[in-house]
Amino acid sequence: MANSFLEASARDRVQAVCDAGSFQEILKPSDRISSPHMALLEQPVAFDDGVVIGRATLGGVPVLVAAQEGEFLGGAIGEVHGAKITALIAKAVQEKPRAVLLIFESGGVRLHEANAGLIAVSEIMRAVCSARAQGVQFIGLIGGSAGCFGGTGLIARCCDVLIMSEEGRLAMSGPEVIETVYGVEEFDSRDRALVWRVSGGKH
């Protein structure tokens, strides 16, 4: 991986974590799966809707993988983005891989899509919990520059195992949101040491 995990793209992270050459992407950008809501709002779209999903091996054993792309709308979850992850989890219940790897990088719900994004988060959480009850193991990885916030943070806490890098951040609300609601006197989002003490992987 040419870049650090912190700065890498979703596909680079998958390639770095999984066995070399083993990743087989499901619903590639060439399939042109994007959010209908963004087009209606004349907002930019991505033909993978900001999440990469597929099959791979890790240490020689089969896994399913989903990796969020923080460079597209901060990795925010919308209807199609969420549906791809939920469908991958349904596939895991059928195929019974050794684990499902969820590589998180998201600020939470895609506000452009309002309730569709909130519903997508709840559907992913329900799918994870249901799959776990059927013996599927979930491993979450957090290390992207966008962090893991909002509804995505809730999904992360549903995993069996959660791995964070020192640069990873996990919280319900991001530092700027906390500052906006409670004021800079209560929480200064520019105080990087404070931010990392509260939500960072290294305490």
Predicted feature descriptions by range:
Residues M1-V136, R197-H203:
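Terminal-region recognition feature
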Residues G108-H203:
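Conserved catalytic cores of soluble enzyme domains
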